[in-house]
A protein has these predicted regions:
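Active-site proximal loops enriched in glycine and acidic residues that flank catalytic Cys/His/Asp
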Residues: 173, 229, 281-283
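Conserved glycine-bearing catalytic or ligand-binding loops at nucleotide- and phosphate-handling centers
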Residues: 207-212, 217-237
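Generic structural hydrophobic/aromatic packing signal, biased to beta-strands
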Residues: 50, 94, 200, 225-227, ...
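Nucleotide/pyrophosphate-binding catalytic subdomain
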Residues: 1-215, 219
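A broad, low-specificity signal marking well-ordered, structured residues that form hydrophobic/aromatic
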Residues: 131, 146, 225, 237, ...
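Internal nucleotide-binding/catalytic subdomain
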Residues: 170, 227, 232, 244-249
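Short gly/pro-enriched beta-turn/loop segments at secondary-structure junctions
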Residues: 164, 220-221, 270-274
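A conserved regulatory-domain signal marking ACT and ACT-like small-molecule sensing domains
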Residues: 238-284
């Protein structure tokens, strides 16, 4: 039975109605025989609100206290999601990063994952539970709560998928995938069906949806990542190597036929007033 790790970002969780919708989608997947592990971000802009409150009290909040505070948004989301799943008659349990065994270094605010002890997660899955994990967080050698910095929930999801030997890591967001350019700026931007890890890293370094650290993890562990819309049932953008893509299609995990396309510009990103063009695989 395949394991799928699904990560939902803040815009996908910013209302009770959206949480209910995700719970219904998860139930459908469970009924199809899939094992689902959910990783959730904080609801909407709640992390920004927590930081704002801390800054109202101190211009330089203690980093240990700040990480403890900032981790709470994801914990709220995970508990609410678990409650929503239980209301649909499903067995579900929420876990903090600590409870999920996510061991990090002690760099508060920008912690790096060292290892994951996934025994608790496996035990819960084997007991028929849908495990909902608070993203963006872990714990250090002194059992202090740490946060992973920008893009931390993406990093959590890919790292967990690799640790659990999941078939795929699905990242749900407010767009239907990666585009050839920012669709808010370029009206005729087109969705990209397939990207190599290397191409996605190039785009991620200059502002595309996922943080480079999560893509690097995907590359290191050969974990396929698909970026999809939380609100539309569309195919998204698959990030992996071509051999893994062929394997996923053969096994029916990726249903739409996608082929590698080498000799075209992949995408254009921008950062401030700086432009950069990188060309790959240009024919002689």
């Amino acid at each position: 039975m395949e394991i799928i790790v699904r990560k939902y970002g803040g815009t996908s969780l910013d209302s009770i109605a959206k949480i209910k919708k995700i719970a219904e989608t998860t139930k459908k997947s469970i009924n199809e025989g899939k094992k689902i592990v959910l990783v959730v971000s904080a609801m909407g802009k709640s992390t920004d609100e927590l930081l704002k409150k801390a800054k109202m009290l101190s211009s330089h909040p203690d980093t240990r206290e700040l990480d403890l505070l900032m981790s709470s948004g994801e914990i709220v989301s995970s508990a609410l999601m678990s409650i929503a799943l239980q209301e649909l008659g499903l067995k579900a349990i929420s876990l903090t990063g600590f409870q999920a065994g996510i061991d990090t270094n002690s760099t508060f605010g920008e912690a790096q994952i060292i290892s994951i002890d996934n025994k608790r997660i496996h035990d819960e899955i084997n007991n028929g539970q849908i495990v909902v994990i608070a993203g963006f967080q872990g714990y250090n050698e002194n059992f202090e709560i740490t946060t992973l910095g920008r893009g931390g929930s993406d990093t959590t999801a890919v790292a967990l998928a690799a640790s659990l030997k999941a078939d795929i890591c699905e990242v749900y967001t407010d767009v239907e995938g990666i585009f050839t350019a920012d669709p808010k700026i370029v009206k005729n931007a087109k969705k990209i069906d397939y990207l190599s890890y290397e191409d996605m890293l190039e785009l991620a370094n200059y502002g595309a949806k996922m943080h480079p650290r999560s893509i690097e993890l995907g590359l290191h562990y050969n974990m396929p990542i698909i970026i999809k819309s939380s609100f539309e049932n569309k195919t998204g953008t698959i990030i992996c190597n071509i051999e893994k893509l062929n394997d996923l299609q053969k096994r029916g995990i990726i249903l739409n036929q996608i082929t590698e396309n080498r000799n075209k510009v992949t995408g254009v990103t921008s950062e401030g007033n700086i432009s950069k063009i990188t060309l790959h695989s240009i024919p002689d």
